[in-house]
């Protein structure tokens, strides 16, 4: 690979050749100090399938069960394929990268990390549960981020009335993969279902950011416990609620953030069948929201 990048560099400089180079991680290359085509290459991220790409073949129940990796989404046996994917990742991705030699320890960590999906991570607890030092846990989280298995969601810090928390949250890149690693079978109405629904919505939002809008994606949580799952740029707060009937308690975070008068819109994405507005907060059916998202209503 280093010699290939050097040759690409030469052809770019001497002949003006254009290349499309793909890969799952540049971790090993960066550690080796090789030519990364600085200033001559643009980085783009390719995510699993989106609702926009699936069109009429999009099925939320299947998404939360199988995830959005193309070969698994359309598989006749997604559960078996997801289990095999986790094994392939451990064997090929981690070992080939030379990221860690202790595969059993990393395997324990990976399943504990999956249980921390969509949360602020307590690294000490993860270290204790994984039976590895905390410094190793930081290293392992770095591996997951570098290999694009895990996304870090920074905190939005502009609120004034309520002091914001500054710690990041973490999301696995695919709801099917994280559910498989957790070893869970989810049912509508359970907290686990809500977490996967939120993970799917994060996937749609981060894909839209990388493919269209380019705007920052963050989340907000106050030290007093109010939280909004996602902030689009500095204009829209979005809360994910996997409920067929959204009540006032479900809107507490959005209502608290609305008091700051910093955002233009406050939206709850839900399983409700029709759009409605409650005290300035918009409640959207998830299908309507993602159609509006990809049509550019929220930027891009």
Question: Residue locations for each model-derived region?
Answer:
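Active-site ExK catalytic segment of metal-dependent nucleases
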Residues: 233-246
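Structural recognition of the conserved hydrophobic beta-strand(s) that form the central parallel beta-sheet
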Residues: 18-24
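Conserved ATPase-coupling elements of RecA-like P-loop NTPase cores
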Residues: 1-8, 31-32
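Domain-level recognition of nuclease-like catalytic cores that cleave nucleotide substrates
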Residues: 273-300
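Conserved AAA+ ATPase "SRH/arginine-finger" region at the nucleotide-binding site
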Residues: 43-55, 76
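Short regulatory helix/loop adjacent to the ATP-binding pocket of P-loop NTPases
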Residues: 27-42, 58
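Accessory nucleic acid-recognition modules appended to NTPase machines
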Residues: 80-236
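Short, polar loop motifs at secondary-structure junctions
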Residues: 26-28, 268-275
């Amino acid at each position: 690979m280093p010699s290939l990048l050097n040759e690409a560099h030469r052809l770019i400089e001497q002949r003006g050749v254009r290349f499309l180079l793909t890969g799952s991680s540049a971790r090993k290359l960066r550690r080796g100090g090789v030519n990364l085509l600085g200033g001559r290459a643009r980085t783009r991220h390719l995510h699993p399938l989106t609702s926009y790409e699936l069109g009429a073949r999009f099925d939320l129940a299947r998404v939360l069960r199988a995830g959005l990796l193309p070969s698994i989404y359309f598989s006749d046996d997604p559960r078996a394929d997801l289990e095999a994917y986790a094994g392939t990742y451990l064997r090929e991705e981690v070992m080939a990268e030379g990221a860690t030699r202790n595969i059993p320890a990393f395997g324990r960590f990976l399943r504990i990390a999956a249980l921390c999906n969509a949360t602020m991570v307590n690294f000490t607890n993860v270290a204790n549960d994984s039976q590895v030092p905390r410094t190793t846990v930081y290293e392992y989280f770095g591996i997951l981020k570098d290999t694009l298995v895990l996304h870090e969601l920074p905190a939005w810090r502009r609120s004034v009335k309520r002091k914001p928390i500054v710690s990041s949250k973490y999301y696995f890149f695919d709801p099917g993969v994280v559910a498989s690693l957790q070893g869970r079978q989810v049912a509508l109405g359970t907290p686990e279902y809500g977490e996967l629904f939120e993970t799917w919505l994060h996937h749609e939002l981060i894909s839209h950011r990388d493919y269209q809008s380019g705007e920052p994606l963050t989340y907000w949580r106050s030290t007093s416990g109010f939280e909004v799952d996602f902030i689009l740029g500095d204009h829209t707060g979005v809360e994910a609620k996997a409920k067929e009937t959204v009540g006032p308690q479900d809107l507490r975070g959005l209502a608290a953030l609305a008091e700051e008068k910093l955002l233009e819109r406050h939206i709850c994405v839900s399983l409700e069948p029709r759009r409605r507005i409650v005290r300035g907060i918009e409640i959207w059916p998830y299908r309507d929201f993602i159609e509006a998202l990809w049509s550019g209503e929220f930027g891009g």
